[in-house]
Every structure is written in structure tokens, then in C-alpha cells.
């Protein structure tokens, strides 16, 4: 497998903190992998994931290097990161930015300046893949928690990212919705070939989907 993301001897310390949140982390995420990042609460999993997209990275002291497709992440323009590095957060309320389902799906592509025919085609493809045609014209406020998180996922996938990063995406979902969401991630990896990097407390459901696992010991 080709190396997609790589951290080499990477450390991060929050401002006004002595102890680093991440200490000398080396990690390789191969292209096409489904990787589950494991470790106890507070070990730095969320902090690590946020280092992988510059716009989400917290302020602090960084040492070591992160590369994406062999290029230092710091040298990759924000537009390319927006398109190629997808990120789904714990709460869809923090990610949804428009009032209508269809507009939420189109918003990212509009922001990057894609033409209307391309936007319509990609939105239609993702609506079909995720089975959300029945609520395509609904207000986002009408959706259940599981539907909102699925919409957040579809809104990221419409960008056709090379890697999909998810930080505890089922933490606010009921068990059935959580199971369905994780199975959808498996489909994305298998059928679309998208690399997946995931932290998830439901390891008994996430690990059977994984091709790789990494453990942080804090």
C-alpha cells in the first residue's frame, strides 16, 4: 500500500502546558486503509486527528513532521486540504452550516468554486449512495441525530476526499444508528476506496471493519 499520511517523531504541546499532549508519535496511514486509532480517554487521539487538517489544528508548539502524499502538510494549500482531507466531528451541530439538506450537500463544492453541472452530479451520486433522497428537500432541523450525522458524512464525501478522518462520530447516536453509521463507513472504504482514519469507542463494531489499528498509550 502507498503511504498517504505519515507522522514522524511528532510532538505537540498546548500553550502554557509543560506536558506534551502528543509525544514522539510515528504513524503511517496507507492509502486505501481502514485504520482505527485506539487508546484510553485523554491519551491524545482527538488532538492527533486535528493535527491532520491545518484549519482544525489547535494552537501550540509542534515538533516533527506530518506529510500527506509525501508533501509536508504545512505546504499543502487550504483549498487542496479542503477537497482531499475530509473530517467528520463528534457532533453534527458543529459541522452543519446551512438550513436545507440539499444545500448542505452542495455547500462545500460551491465554496471551492465547482461549476453547477459538477455540483448537481456529485450531490445526486452521494444522495443515492447514502440513501437520503427521501429527505433531500427537508430542513436540517427536521432530521434525527443519526440523519444529521449521515448528512455531515455525505457532505464531506461529496468532495471526493482521499482520506476521511472521523473523531468519535457515533458518540451522540443511539446503538442502532451508530451501527448503521459504522457499516456505512465500511462501504465507503470498500466500494469507493476512500482511506478511513477513525477514533471510536464502540471498538467491538469498528475493529471488524478495520484493515489496520494503532494504539496510543497516553
What are these regions (language model features)?
Residues 139-143, 147:
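Conserved ABC ATPase signature
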Residues 160:
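Conserved catalytic motifs of ABC-family nucleotide-binding domains
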Residues 200-201:
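H-loop/switch region of ABC-family ATPase nucleotide-binding domains
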Amino acid at each position: 500500500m502507498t503511504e498517504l499520511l505519515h507522522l514522524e517523531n511528532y510532538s505537540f504541546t498546548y500553550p502554557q502546558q509543560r506536558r506534551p499532549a502528543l509525544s514522539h508519535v510515528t504513524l503511517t496511514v496507507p492509502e486505501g486503509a481502514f485504520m482505527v486509532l485506539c487508546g484510553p480517554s485523554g491519551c491524545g487521539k482527538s488532538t492527533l486527528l486535528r493535527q491532520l487538517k491545518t484549519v482544525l489544528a489547535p494552537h501550540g508548539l509542534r515538533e516533527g513532521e506530518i506529510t500527506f502524499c509525501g508533501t509536508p502538510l504545512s505546504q499543502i494549500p487550504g483549498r487542496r486540504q479542503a477537497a482531499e482531507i475530509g473530517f467528520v466531528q463528534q457532533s453534527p451541530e458543529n459541522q452543519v452550516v446551512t438550513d436545507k439538506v440539499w444545500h448542505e450537500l452542495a455547500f462545500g463544492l460551491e465554496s471551492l468554486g465547482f461549476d453547477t453541472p459538477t455540483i448537481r452530479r456529485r450531490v445526486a451520486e452521494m444522495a443515492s449512495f447514502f440513501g437520503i433522497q427521501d429527505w433531500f428537500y427537508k430542513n436540517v432541523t427536521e432530521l434525527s441525530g443519526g440523519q444529521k450525522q449521515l448528512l455531515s458524512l455525505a457532505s464531506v464525501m461529496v468532495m471526493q476526499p482521499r482520506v476521511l478522518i472521523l473523531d468519535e462520530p457515533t458518540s451522540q447516536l443511539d446503538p442502532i444508528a451508530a451501527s448503521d453509521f459504522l457499516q456505512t463507513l465500511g462501504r465507503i472504504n470498500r466500494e469507493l476506496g476512500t482511506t478511513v482514519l477513525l477514533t471510536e469507542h464502540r471498538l467491538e463494531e469498528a475493529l471488524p471493519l478495520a484493515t489496520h489499528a494503532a494504539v496510543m498509550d497516553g
